[in-house]
Amino acid sequence: MSRIGYKVVNLPEGVEVKQDGNVVTVKGPKGELTREFSDKITIKVEGNEVSFERSAEDNKTKALHGTTRSNFHNMVVGVSEGFKKELELRGVGYRAQMKGKTLVLNVGYSHPVEFEEEEGITFETPSATSIIVSGINKEEVGDCAARIRATRAPEPYKGKGIRYVGEYVRRKEGKTGK
């Protein structure tokens, strides 16, 4: 049984929490995030500590307890520090570049693949073969990075494609000739 829901979240300096029923707003130096949580979990803000209590002991509520605490913690980290995902391109001629607020990928298709910056998400290309996706919402940063990776996922024979930095791609052996 996980006990993550019982851990108290400490608020860093410059982060403030407003609660309106089940809707919680976290404001910090990087921005502001609002989220609606389940009414089965009670959120208590005391000074610079936030605790979570569940109303029932059924399995659904127990699962929500830890999830609520983790989601809230991610909101606090997002508005104070932010999140980023780094991707790298491997393959001959695979390149990424920024054109204004648009990320343009040349990844072996007959056409370049373009991604517009969404609200709260920024792209950086420190080199032609690396991309950094950053923002304050962990879910949105992860989803956006996953969509970029899905345009050309790493293939198992040569390892070409877009991958997360540090991701291990399991390689396969090619066909053996006669």
UniProtKB/Swiss-Prot annotation:
Keywords: Ribonucleoprotein, Ribosomal protein, RNA-binding, rRNA-binding. GO terms for molecular function: rRNA binding; structural constituent of ribosome. The keyword rRNA-binding applies. Part of the 50S ribosomal subunit. Belongs to the universal ribosomal protein uL6 family. It comes from Ligilactobacillus salivarius (strain UCC118). This protein binds to the 23S rRNA, and is important in its secondary structure. It is located near the subunit interface in the base of the L7/L12 stalk, and near the tRNA binding site of the peptidyltransferase center. This is Large ribosomal subunit protein uL6. GO terms for biological process: cytoplasmic translation. The keyword Ribonucleoprotein applies. NCBIfam families: L6_bact (TIGR03654). GO terms for cellular component: cytosolic large ribosomal subunit. InterPro entries: Ribosomal_uL6-like, Ribosomal_uL6-like_a/b-dom_sf, Ribosomal_uL6_a/b-dom, Ribosomal_uL6_bac-type, Ribosomal_uL6_CS.
